[in-house]
C-alpha cells in the first residue's frame, strides 16, 4: 500500500468538497447500476469527505440515484484530471439524518433545496472498500491499489 498516494488522493478529494468555482473542477463521477442492470454515471459535487474513506453527496429522496441505491448499494466514484485518477469502489446509502445533512450543507445547495432541514434534501454516503489511485505530483508518480 502506498501511503503517500492515499494521502495525496485524500487531499485532492478534500479540495473538491464544496467546490463552487464552476466547470468540472469540483465534481466526482458516481457510477450506480440502473433498473435494467446497466451502469449509470452522474457527475456530482462532493459535499464532505474523510480522505478516501467516505464521501457524501446530495440528492432528493425520489431521484433516480436514490431509487437505484435502494435496489443495489454497490457503487464506484471516480475523480480525475490530467494529473490524477482516483477510483473508489464500495457501498452507498441514502441517509436522512439531520446531523449528517447539517454537516454537509453548503450555500450553493440552496439553488436546489431550502436548507439542511428541507424534506427533499437527503445525503448520499459512499464508503470505500477498494481503491485504485494514480497521482502525478510534479515528476513523482504515485500509485496505490488496495482494500480498506
Segments (PLM) and residue ranges:
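Short, low-complexity N-terminal intrinsically disordered segments enriched in polar/charged residues
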Residues: 1-7
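A short, Trp-centered hydrophobic/proline-enriched beta-strand micro-motif
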Residues: 12-35, 75-77
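N-terminal leader/targeting helix
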Residues: 25-53
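ATP-grasp fold ATP-binding core
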Residues: 30, 69, 123
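A short mixed-secondary-structure module that forms the rim of ligand-binding clefts
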Residues: 45-82
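Charged, gly/pro-rich active-site loop segments
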Residues: 87-148
Amino acid at each position: 500500500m502506498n501511503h503517500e498516494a492515499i494521502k495525496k488522493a485524500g487531499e485532492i478529494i478534500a479540495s473538491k468538497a464544496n467546490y463552487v468555482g464552476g466547470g468540472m473542477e469540483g465534481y466526482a463521477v458516481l457510477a450506480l447500476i440502473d433498473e435494467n442492470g446497466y451502469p449509470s454515471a452522474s457527475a456530482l459535487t462532493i459535499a464532505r469527505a474523510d480522505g478516501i474513506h467516505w464521501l457524501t453527496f446530495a440528492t432528493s429522496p425520489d431521484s433516480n440515484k436514490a431509487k437505484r441505491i435502494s435496489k443495489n448499494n454497490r457503487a464506484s466514484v471516480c475523480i480525475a484530471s490530467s494529473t490524477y485518477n482516483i477510483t473508489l469502489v464500495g457501498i452507498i446509502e441514502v441517509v436522512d439524518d439531520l446531523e449528517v445533512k447539517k454537516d454537509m450543507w453548503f450555500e450553493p445547495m440552496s439553488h436546489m433545496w431550502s436548507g439542511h432541514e428541507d424534506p427533499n434534501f437527503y445525503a448520499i454516503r459512499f464508503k470505500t472498500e477498494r481503491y485504485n489511485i494514480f497521482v502525478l505530483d510534479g515528476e513523482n508518480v504515485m500509485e496505490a491499489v488496495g482494500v480498506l
